[in-house]
């Protein structure tokens, strides 16, 4: 249970640090890196809500978790609950620098339409990271191997509500799967290739549930191809490959170049394929070092709030809070609610539903 609570907290810590990093990059006050060099680094930092607010990544992840912890009778009821919470949430997001595709996706939701509440049209603009950053809790809720079918369905439908584009909603499947793998205790190097093995099941589900699959088809293989190239680059594509290989020189500047290369928009972590990819890469390189994870996932020149949210949550599931400076989470915005959601997700995940 403690790691479930840690996951909800550290996803939010990663968001606050990464979001703060983006905000400081866009201001005259200098980067977080410069700020930390003047003090004792992360150990001296206190993430108070006034100075370190969270972004829409946290708000939407909490909305997903709150829906998952209600007493729904069937998945359709769960989806209606998600729609209701997303629509309520998005009205309050203006001060949180929301992902534009999240706003646009939520505008298509119909909470008052019982039958069609969560059915949204295909969107060319729905490829952003926002589906991936709100879905880790789905993997926490349905982490058991025998719940894989449910995890696939819920993560895809949750993703499609706001990001109805394969690059977007496959991002939510990816982060949900990674959360489930962390809880199952799977080796980190397996996660990427095991996720790729699930994609045919996801495609089969979509063929059955999406009426006009043709318009999705041309975009479907982009996500898969990007991940295949990534795993080959790190030499962990095959089951026999057990150690990720990184370049000899992989400092902050080189990482930013690499993150841009993985992106299709020149800004690392902007879309549903590369936000989880950067988080995963950071986890592979960091081991149990929280400081190293922050350097790689929270303090780069891309969408560091998105990658920080995903990486922080998964780190919590893998390692808990032991190596994380307490100042980062003791005064964190929404701390009590986040811990309660972690507790509830743990309890419900051990019960059958």
From Swiss-Prot:
It holds the Pfam family ADP_ribosyl_GH. Keywords: Cytoplasm, Phosphoprotein. The modification Phosphoserine is found at residue 27. Disulfide bonds: none annotated. This is Inactive ADP-ribosyltransferase ARH2. One of its GO terms (cellular component) is sarcomere. Its main location: cytoplasm. It comes from Rattus norvegicus (Rat). One of its GO terms (biological process) is protein de-ADP-ribosylation. PANTHER family: ADP-RIBOSYLGLYCOHYDROLASE, INACTIVE ADP-RIBOSYLTRANSFERASE ARH2.
